[in-house]
Amino acid sequence: MRTRFLLTLILIVLIGGTACNRSSKLAKQSIFMKRATGFAYEVLVVMDKDAWKGEAGRLLYDQLTAPIPGLPQNEPAMRVTYAEPFQFNGLLHYVRNIIHVRIDESLYTKVSVHKEKDRWATGQEVVTLNAPSSQILAEYLEKQGTSLVAWLGEKERERQADYLESSHSVWVNDKVRARFNAQLYAPEEMCSYKDTADFFWVTDHGTRGRIDMVVYSFPYVSGRTFTLDYLVAMRDSVLGEHIQGAFPGSYMTTEKRFTPSYEAISKNGEYC
């Protein structure tokens, strides 16, 4: 029996995703707590001024603002705002992502990391970095700093998934479920679509930050199906057939100047 391999391709901007067996966290948040403020992928760094201007601060800033992989133009992973410790009060306590750096050789003997959710506001993530010196903190960031950026990005995606779980395009989800027996929580702004056998394309026709989402399936024939070259070739074939360009003979394809990222994942304990 042949199984079918289902792919979801999010084009232009990766806005949403699905949450697996996750109850809505939005509904459970306390009504007595202020909601976190700020934009997605924005982080406030609270750090001593000398340390911020030194090696550790520069390294932390460079890691937080490193380009997002896979985009045709450089865009920073996070937008960084800085505050000195004495400025960290009032409304700044409600920023959605906060990195609080404390350097004190009389209190700390090594670098420690403490992560706390909803410290001052709901929907907030606070990371506290403790270190005995700026040099030791810099050495730690050289080895582990990118994992902190990846963690912040993961938390932003979780927030978006939680939001889309409770507020998404019902008709898009219904069509994908009927066609592919899968769920797709797309933004409510989706307005136009193309629906054929084994292929579904939906767009919001946005003039700024347009969102296109494509779902398609094809037969699984061998282990070679899950290689990067095969998946890219299949994607180009499907998009070339279904999404024509503005000029005769043009069509959507993979940009070859940027190597596609590829990662095998498991869902509910199954390879996919």
Write out the residue ranges for each language-model feature.
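N-terminal secretory signal peptides that target proteins for export/translocation
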Residues: 1-2
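Sec-dependent N-terminal signal peptides
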Residues: 5-14
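C-terminal motif of bacterial Sec signal peptides marking the signal peptidase cleavage site
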Residues: 16-19
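Solvent-exposed alpha-helical segments and adjacent loops
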Residues: 25-47, 102-169
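N-terminal "mature-domain start" segment
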Residues: 26-42, 50-53, 57, 62-66, ...
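Acidic/His-rich structured neighborhood in mature extracellular/periplasmic domains
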Residues: 139-140, 148-220
